[in-house]
Amino acid sequence: MTVQEIKNNLKKFDRKQLYKDKVAKMQHSMEHLGVDGIICFKPQNTFFLSGFNPVLYSHPVVVIVPREGDAVLLVHSLRARHSADEAAIDDIRLFGMWANQKPIANDAYTAIGIIADDLKLKGKVIGYEGDFISLSQYQKIQGITNAPKMVDVSDFLKRSRNIKDEYEINLLRLSSYLTNIGMDVALQNIRKSEAEASISAEIAMRETWAKELSEFEISSFGNNEGGIVTALWCYSNSGYRVPYGCECPGDRIPLEGEVCLPVCWAAIDGYHSENERTVMIGKIPDNYEKAYDAMLAGRANVFKMMKAGVTASEVYDAGVAPYIEAGFKDFLPGRIGHGVGLSLHEFPSLAKDNNLVLEEGMCVTVEPGLVFAGWGSTRHSDTVVVRKDGIEILTSSCEDRLIR
């Protein structure tokens, strides 16, 4: 599918209605969850429900969803125009003084209390994000709403985000396209230095975005002390630095007989993709080359068997089987992939003991890898979509067995 075809597909969707549908689906689940309302602060969750990303979260963005009725988006007055232009939630309330805006309160928590009163959530059971908010926030919410009971809905939100609709998958196709561009350029510069490979990939991704995709945002989600305006990233590590897992690139030039691992990440309208490739620099030691070929075999196994209906543990077993056969049982990874979407690392983990049944629309990485401390690693990572009868592989590189 070409970039233009993907863009044409996206035009068929009513973006704001898709976000409204997510809210409606959440409301439909509230009786089962045993809650009367849900209050979200986590940037990925508030975006998932509202379609609004202020980029900088120094002032909280809050979505309050009652079991019945319309959801409310609460933002600082500074974000009034931005949220009005982009959010799918119609009822936007403001807090904090800024220019000539008319906030309902000076601070977010007083505003939440007013909204809870309007939505008749005072004295009701409230769902909260136990994996995100602090104890102080929990206590404030409970006090403001007079909730007799608070229910952690974190797992529900994680699972809701994991299954993507076709609109989200098209965005993932575009972010994957950018990582593919970046990876090809990183491979062309891999022998120069970690820094050269990394920056050349980032430049290529940014130039491609500017020429072909600049109508889409490439930001990610910040926190209360900063924001991520541009989420087109690459880092390449070499030799003994590869097992660090994630490290800033430096001036190190890879040596003959080592491996390099360039990692390209990209986001389009909030949806992230990951593309990683292990590159052999010349001839590597036989034992490590054996591990490299086992990695390719494990990856091929997963591509062949992965589909809706299989379990995460079955995927794991297929991915590591060639490692065991090749004598690397003592080096097996804890997982061979993870969910991607509004975060680079999200639910679920493709781990040995995870009996989660994969469903159509789930988006995960496939990355069966080995780590050899002090030497390097063998790992490719691809972003894939689980389909009824197989998978759709979104990421790629010019070849699989990479020698430079």
Listing of model-derived features with the role each one plays in the protein:
Residues 1-404:
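Active-site neighborhoods and metal-handling regions in enzymes and metal-associated proteins
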